[in-house]
Design a protein with these regions (language model features):
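Flexible loop linkers connecting adjacent transmembrane helices
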Residues: 38-64, 86-96, 100, 108-144, ...
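Membrane-interface loop-to-helix entry segments
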Residues: 24-31, 35-48, 152, 170-177, ...
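Helix-loop-helix module between adjacent transmembrane segments
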Residues: 32-33, 73, 102-127, 134, ...
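Transmembrane helix-loop junctions in multi-pass membrane proteins
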Residues: 5, 36-40, 79-84, 160-173, ...
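N-terminal alpha-helical transmembrane segments of multi-pass membrane transport
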Residues: 1-78, 88-95, 106, 418, ...
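Alpha-helical membrane segments and immediately flanking helix-loop junctions
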Residues: 57-90, 116-140, 151-154, 158, ...
């Protein structure tokens, strides 16, 4: 029975992530890049400056940096470690090239999401801020498109409960913990008709309890936790990736060549082991969206809470999230995997990246495994926290503000975290891809439809910027 369900999930994943959606995703990014005049290149230095410089005044609940960290806490997760590995294993090294392409054009859509999030956000009487694609669809496109906003909100709840928010993250955590403490599965117990390591069960329970303690604190607590953890864990992970690349620098040119050649001729790199260009594109773009969430529509939910009065400023800050997540962190992971050859030895999931760390770093394998486990636990945990916030905001809009529904969602979310470790790696990633595609579609329609608004806001902002020095 479970095998048939997995086969159906895999078929649905392939159907949704077919050529039409891939073309639409790339076309929307190219369209916004052209309309904005390559803003992701021209204004990246200013965006990085705004990222750490808070703006005074404006409505909102957290600083722009806090909103970015909340968004990064939801994007920097298993996608950076496990997602890249699954993409390279299934699509070959060329999948990383398509992740870069998706990220480059995704920066333009991420900028657009940030602009629209601030422009169309809703300020409640008590100062509480609500925003995201459902609001810029309804307010920007008109009431007749409210059904599209509701559709986005529904799929957003599903992504949180069954995809990026829970299953993939806690599955990644439990796998990393198992690889470190019980790699040979010597200590197992029969549960749900299958054998599981005790470490998997213990990890699931601990993560579920920790998540429950934090998410009951609301956005303020999530922002506080993520502002401390996200920069620290990202730096630690990048440092060890740089060390690995430094110790194996001679292999970098060949790895880059394999990535570029594999993007257009996968068989030449993989020897026919891995599929076609279409698979490399599909895996690269799908995992790229999973990782950086550009086009997904999740980040503008957090961006709407930023204390700012300038939509374009927040758009620039939001754009840096994709740069940090994919261009920096995912690239590091991908290069480590390709250089060490861990992608084509029959492993899957976190085991691929673990093998890369063990083979590429001049440390005891246990130390390398511990480093990766620690990074993955922090990455995935903060992603779980960020996606609870996203899911709650989606439900809040979908249910018309029912706080009872939100409370029920929180407990269902915690329950999903508890059950996540007991699913297969392939199943959790296929389910995540399915809901990601369904969630991205309404958001992309809105971005293209409101592209004129984004361009006008951008022109007006930079015109005023030349005249004033305080924005």
């Amino acid at each position: 029975m479970f095998e048939k369900i997995n086969e159906w999930i895999k078929w649905l994943d392939g159907a949704i992530w077919g050529l039409p959606l891939i073309i639409f995703i790339l076309a929307a990014g190219i369209f916004m890049t052209i309309r904005l005049g390559g803003l992701q290149i021209r204004k990246l230095p200013k965006a990085l400056k705004y990222m750490v410089k808070n703006e005074e005044g404006g409505h909102g609940e957290v600083s722009s940096f806090g909103a970015l960290c909340t968004a990064l806490s939801a994007t920097i997760g298993t996608g950076n470690i496990v997602g890249v590995a699954t993409a390279v294993v299934a699509g070959g090294p060329g999948a990383l090239f398509w992740m870069w392409i998706a990220a480059f054009f995704g920066m333009a859509t991420k900028f657009s999401e940030g602009v629209l999030a601030i422009k169309y956000r809703h300020i409640c009487e008590d100062g509480h801020v609500l925003g995201g694609p459902f609001y810029y669809i309804e307010k920007g496109m008109g009431k007749r498109w409210k059904w599209l906003a509701k559709l986005f909100a529904f799929f957003g709840m599903c992504v949180g409960l069954f995809g990026i928010g829970t299953f993939t993250q806690v599955n990644g955590i439990s796998s990393a913990v198992k690889n470190f403490f019980d790699a040979d599965s010597r200590h197992t117990v029969n549960l749900f008709g299958a054998e599981y390591s005790y470490t998997v069960i213990i990890a699931g329970v601990i993560v579920a309890v920790c998540v429950a303690l934090v998410i009951l604190g609301g956005l303020g607590r999530i922002a506080q936790v993520s502002q401390i953890v996200v920069p620290f864990m990202a730096i630690i992970y990048v440092v060890f990736c740089v060390l690995l690349l430094g110790f194996n620098y001679q292999a970098i040119p060949n790895a880059l060549a394999a990535i570029v050649e594999g993007a257009f001729n996968p068989q030449a790199v993989t020897g026919g082991i891995v599929g076609s260009i279409a698979i490399a594109m599909q895996m690269g773009i799908a995992r790229g969206i999973f990782s950086n969430e550009a086009r997904l529509g999740s980040a503008p939910i957090a961006a709407a809470a930023a204390k700012t009065k300038e939509p374009v400023r927040q758009g620039l800050v939001s754009m840096t999230g994709t740069f940090i997540d994919t261009i920096v962190i995912c690239t590091m992971t991908g290069l480590c995997i390709v250089i060490t050859g861990s992608w084509n030895v029959g492993l899957e999931g976190v085991a691929v990246t673990t093998r890369a760390f063990q083979n590429g770093l001049p440390f005891d394998p246990k130390i390398a495994s511990f480093i990766l486990m620690a990074c993955l636990v922090f990455f995935a945990f903060t992603t779980i926290l960020g996606w609870d916030y996203y899911g709650e905001r989606c439900l809040e809009y979908f249910s018309g503000g029912s706080q009872k529904a939100v409370l029920i969602y929180r407990w269902l979310y915690i329950l999903a975290v508890f059950f996540g470790p007991y699913m297969t790696v392939e199943a959790v990633w296929n389910i995540a891809d399915i809901f990601n595609g369904l969630m991205a579609f309404p958001n992309l329609i809105a971005i293209v439809a409101l592209s004129g608004v984004v361009c006008k806001e951008t022109r007006d902002y930079f015109k005023r910027l030349k005249e004033r020095s305080d924005i």
